UniProtKB/Swiss-Prot annotation:
Keywords: Cytoplasm, Lipid biosynthesis, Lipid metabolism, NAD, NADP, Nucleotide-binding, Oxidoreductase, Phospholipid biosynthesis, Phospholipid metabolism
Active-site positions on this chain: K195
Protein name as it appears in the record: Glycerol-3-phosphate dehydrogenase [NAD(P)+] 1
Main location class: cytoplasm
GO-annotated biological processes: carbohydrate metabolic process; glycerol-3-phosphate biosynthetic process; glycerol-3-phosphate catabolic process; glycerophospholipid metabolic process; phospholipid biosynthetic process
Role: Catalyzes the reduction of the glycolytic intermediate dihydroxyacetone phosphate (DHAP) to sn-glycerol 3-phosphate (G3P), the key precursor for phospholipid synthesis.
Species whose genome carries this gene: Lactobacillus delbrueckii subsp. bulgaricus (strain ATCC 11842 / DSM 20081 / BCRC 10696 / JCM 1002 / NBRC 13953 / NCIMB 11778 / NCTC 12712 / WDCM 00102 / Lb 14)
Length: 338
């Protein structure tokens, strides 16, 4: 039995915690709010995030991070990107006190605004400055709602150490979620982060009533943008043809379970961003990630017109119809160009 500390009692953190408990591991779940911790402990539900679903009753929750991290072998992070650094700082303080060096698994998908750093880079800054070997990223086409119902799912675990990725693979895998390993944590993180931006665009097209041709074109050209940024960051181009690339892009751009898609859909129907985000009730990672992506594109002169248009619509007041016209009137060129 492995002792796992899951940080973040949102939908994905709760589902992963329950799944790991199903696998026979001891799981403690950190919740930011006492009311959620109490509900999980008393009723084994988390109704604010997941309706009609019950957690494995062996999962226990607490707002005391020191208690949650006590004697843990693995720390699973499932908190918003905007909170990842502050949570990492708190984790480091606890680890300094107890002297443990657990594996760090990130299920967070995003790029930090301001620093433009990926999550494992933040872990290196705040927790393990000597290297990346004990850090693993978990990413792929995996909506919490489907995994909660034990729908068949495949996910990637990536680390600079394939041996450590394989150790996590054995801990996480079961008969309804299959995990694959990768030695490209950079590419896997970029795929998981930037697909959220493309999903907002996919939702906008759906909200405007565009059909299958437009959706397919958007996802394909969106994948080209993701690959372009990933390679610039040091990722391997073939990673983006896998689960954390095209796989995650497909599920996020085509499902009503996607918060980013739902955000875009409402924008396409004419609702302002502030109203959409207020009504969502959960974090829309793509709306934050696009800020970092836009700055990265400008800094490195990367051609990412879809991402740039989403940024302009969200934060510069650009009109959606005007951005679509600009997109379709761009200079003609070859399809394949990294």
């Amino acid at each position: 039995m492995t002792k796992i500390s899951a940080l973040g009692a949102g939908s994905w953190g709760s589902v992963l915690a329950s799944m790991l408990a199903d696998n026979g591991h001891e799981v403690a779940l950190y919740a930011h709010r006492q009311v959620i911790a109490d509900e999980i402990n008393q009723d084994h539900t988390n109704l604010h995030y997941m309706k009609d679903w019950t957690l494995n009753p062996s999962v226990w929750a607490s707002t005391d991070m020191g208690q949650v991290l006590k004697d843990c072998d693995v720390i699973l992070f499932a908190v918003p990107t905007s909170a990842i650094r502050s949570v990492a700082k708190a984790v480091r303080q606890v680890l300094d006190e107890n002297g443990r060096q657990p594996y760090l698994v990130s299920a967070t998908k995003g790029i930090e605004s301001g620093t433009k750093k990926l999550v494992l880079q933040i872990f290196k800054d705040e927790i393990y400055p000597d290297g990346f070997d004990k850090m693993i990223v978990l990413s792929g086409p995996s909506h919490a709602e489907n995994t909660a119902q034990k729908d068949l799912t495949a996910i990637t675990l990536a680390s600079t150490s394939l041996d450590n990725a394989a150790k996590m693979q054995k801990i996480f895998s079961n008969d309804y979620v299959r995990f694959y390993t990768s030695n490209d944590p950079i590419g896997v993180q970029v795929g998981g982060a930037v697909k959220n931006v493309i999903a907002i665009a996919a939702g906008i097209l759906a909200g405007l009533g565009y059909g299958d041709n437009a959706k397919a074109a958007l996802m394909t050209r969106g994948l080209a943008e993701i690959t372009r940024l990933g390679v610039a960051f040091g990722g391997q181009p073939w990673t983006f043809s896998g689960l954390s690339g095209i796989g995650d892009l497909i599920v996020t751009c085509t499902s009503v379970n996607s918060r980013n898609w739902r955000c875009g859909y409402q924008l396409g129907q004419g609702k302002p961003l502030d109203e959409v985000l207020a009504n969502m009730g959960q974090v829309v990672e793509g709306a934050t990630t696009v800020k970092a992506v836009y700055e990265i594109c400008d800094k490195y002169s990367l051609d990412m017109p879809i991402s740039a248009s989403i940024y302009k619509v969200l934060y510069e007041g650009a009109k959606i119809d005007d951005e679509i016209k600009l997109m379709m009137s761009r200079q003609l060129g070859p399809e394949i160009r990294i």
